[in-house]
Structures are given as C-alpha cells and as structure tokens.
C-alpha cells in the first residue's frame, strides 16, 4: 500500500494529508460509528480526531503517546503512556489498532510483543494497520535541515585547521 507523505514542509500533518490519510485508511478497513479505535504513537491526535469526526464515533478513540503535547486533539482520549504498558493492562477490545510512523522506534522484541498483545485485543474482523515511511521516497523534512547544519559545522571546523 502506498500513501503520499505529509505536506513535506513541516513535521505536522497538513489538513490535506489528514483527509487523504483517512480516505486511504477507510479503503483498507470498514469502520462505522460503533468502531473502537486505538492509535499507538498518536502524536497530537489530529488524524485520529479527524477520523472520529468523519465517522461520528459514539466513543472517543484512544490515542497513546509518550509525549503529552499541549495542543492535542480534544476529540480523542489521550493517554501519555508507553504502548507496552498500556497493552499489557488494557482490557478493551478494538476494531482497529493503528501504528503510524512509529514502529521503527521500538526494539525488535518489543515490536513482537506489541503485535502479539494487539492481536489479542482485536474484535472479530478487527485489524492492526501499520504505516511506516518509505525511506527512499520520503525524507523527513528535518533531515535536510540537520544535514545543512552538520555541513556548516564541518566547514567551520575545516577552516580552523
């Protein structure tokens, strides 16, 4: 599956990206107003909040992140918690467990545990959907900035010798 990267100018998702992401997602899984959704690594929860509104969810979706952003979306239940800790003690079941652009941040053994625990928390016909960056076709916007700063620093050091 392929989906265009965010707006490629900022780390935050643009409205057009959020809309295209949700449309793409809804082609992968049938969800409705009764669906239960968990987002592992939700960030500010903008995508999850938008999806909640689009589906008119009866229950707020749950978003997990290890950073508690001040400007997080109010349409979700946000939990500042490590995914493994949440999955180990959670008893709720989900129709969709979403892992967007975060799977690479976990250790291999933790990825296996996250997937195993997630599978046990799915409702019948539920899905785990993992999105990750294609490193060849998508460059994180900050990489080019970091590269320029590193080159500038290197050039300054060269001048001092």
Predicted segments, located by residue:
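Short catalytic micro-motifs in class I SAM-dependent methyltransferases
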Residues: 101-102
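Short glycine-centered segments of the SAM/dcSAM-binding site in methyltransferase folds
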Residues: 36, 126-127
